[in-house]
Amino acid sequence: MTDAQPILVTAAILVDGDRILVCQRHHSDRYGLQWEFPGGKVRVGEDLKVALRRELVEELAIEADVGEEVFRLRYRYPDRYVEVVFLAVRSFRGTLENRVFEAVEWAPRPALPSYDFLEADRELVRRIARGEIV
């Protein structure tokens, strides 16, 4: 794959005390049943925070108060190249409703590494579990 520019994606690190919201990809999706943070592709010309708010409404039916950038990575999967910008979310309005995932859980921070996360997210997961991020 020789893509010069990565696909821009934004994802939320939703924090509730010592718990982090994690989402399991639907079994029929690419990388099915692996865990990730909610979010999605940024549209051309779209602000990162606006994109994440839109994705969280679509995926979880919440209106998020999107905060600061906490981590950024680039990762080359066999079939695509992505740049993921992770933004903190410490509050939201509405009741969480799983609209697209196999499962959604509030995971205790220390337990995060026990989930089978997407390869690209694993270093971030370790850093969150150690309390280095958010």
Positions of predicted regions on the chain:
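A conserved beta-turn-beta hairpin within the catalytic core of GNAT-like acetyltransferases
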Residues: 29-34
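Active-site-adjacent beta-strand/loop module that shapes the phosphate/pyrophosphate-binding cleft
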Residues: 63, 73-96, 103-106, 128
